[in-house]
């Protein structure tokens, strides 16, 4: 499989996953122009569009893409029904597109109907889980978002996180501010600074590594709890998550 990240807007990524026959899926096309350019350059043949949630920077290019490819199915959660989705999918549903199997995972939090698409090893998770971070709570509750990222964290180690924004460096700066002595975070921040200075993407990233450098996946870490002056018992880890999210919102 060939995975391509297509930059869009200021910091979005539209994902394209193609097989050997150059049949591909397009994930969260916020705008159409860069997608059409990539399709033409690589001679890819789109088989489907996958939407994770209803925000315009993820669905804005759907109408024009459907103009160019009238028969293309557009999969998405119920909240995308008015944003171009032609096939509504729900948690636990399975899709087979261009010979690749996809499982739908409900991940409410950023929006109430947000979903992710998992096709081993690829995880298209929209604005739920970012490298070294997670999405803002624009509609859901902290409990929902914490449960969602924990659900994604249970996927296999080799899972490749294909999120929709280039937020890695800013997320690492926040993580370093919380855990300045953490060598994994400090080293990775330096690596990403060099990568981004060359305008190269920081994604995708393996879930196994993400568990080390993403503070939102480390809410049970005693050192982390001490740093944010939280002494939550194991059944209150959502309060640790909530405190981290609150601090990140104002960072």
Curated annotation (Swiss-Prot):
The keyword Chloroplast does not apply. The keyword Protein transport does not apply. Pathway: Secondary metabolite metabolism; methylglyoxal degradation; (R)-lactate from methylglyoxal: step 2/2. InterPro entries: Clx_II_MBL (IPR035680), Glyoxalase_II_hydrolase (IPR050110), HAGH_C (IPR032282), Hydroxyacylglutathione_Hdrlase (IPR017782), Metallo-B-lactamas (IPR001279), RibonucZ/Hydroxyglut_hydro (IPR036866). Keywords: Hydrolase, Metal-binding, Zinc. Its EC number is 3.1.2.6. Its cofactor is Zn(2+). It comes from the Bacteria. One of its GO terms (molecular function) is hydroxyacylglutathione hydrolase activity. Zn(2+) 1 binds at residues 53, 55, 110, 127. NCBIfam families: GSH_gloB. Thiolesterase that catalyzes the hydrolysis of S-D-lactoyl-glutathione to form glutathione and D-lactic acid. Belongs to the metallo-beta-lactamase superfamily. Glyoxalase II family. This is Hydroxyacylglutathione hydrolase. It comes from Yersinia pestis (strain Pestoides F).
């Amino acid at each position: 499989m060939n995975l391509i990240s297509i930059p869009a807007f200021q910091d979005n990524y539209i994902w394209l996953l193609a097989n050997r026959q150059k049949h591909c899926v397009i994930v969260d096309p916020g705008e159409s122009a860069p997608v059409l350019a990539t399709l033409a350059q690589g001679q890819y043949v789109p088989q489907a569009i996958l939407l994770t949630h209803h925000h315009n920077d993820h669905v804005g290019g759907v109408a024009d893409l459907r103009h160019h490819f009238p028969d293309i199915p557009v999969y998405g959660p119920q909240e995308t029904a008015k944003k171009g989705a032609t096939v509504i999918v729900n948690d636990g549903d399975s899709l087979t597109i261009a010979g690749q199997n996809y499982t739908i995972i409900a991940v409410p939090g950023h929006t109430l109907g947000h979903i992710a698409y998992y096709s081993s090893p690829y995880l298209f998770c929209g604005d739920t889980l970012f490298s070294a971070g997670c999405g803002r709570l624009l509609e859901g509750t902290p409990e929902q978002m914490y449960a969602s990222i924990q659900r994604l964290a249970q996927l296999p180690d080799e899972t490749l996180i294909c999120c929709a924004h280039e937020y890695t460096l800013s997320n690492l700066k926040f993580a370093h501010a919380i855990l300045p002595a953490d060598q994994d975070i400090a080293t990775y921040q330096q690596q990403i600074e060099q990568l981004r200075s060359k305008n190269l993407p920081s994604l995708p990233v393996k879930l196994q590594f993400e568990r080390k450098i993403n503070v939102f996946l480390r809410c049970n870490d005693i050192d982390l709890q001490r740093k944010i002056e939280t002494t939550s018992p194991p059944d209150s880890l959502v309060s640790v998550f909530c405190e981290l999210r609150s601090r990140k919102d104002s960072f």
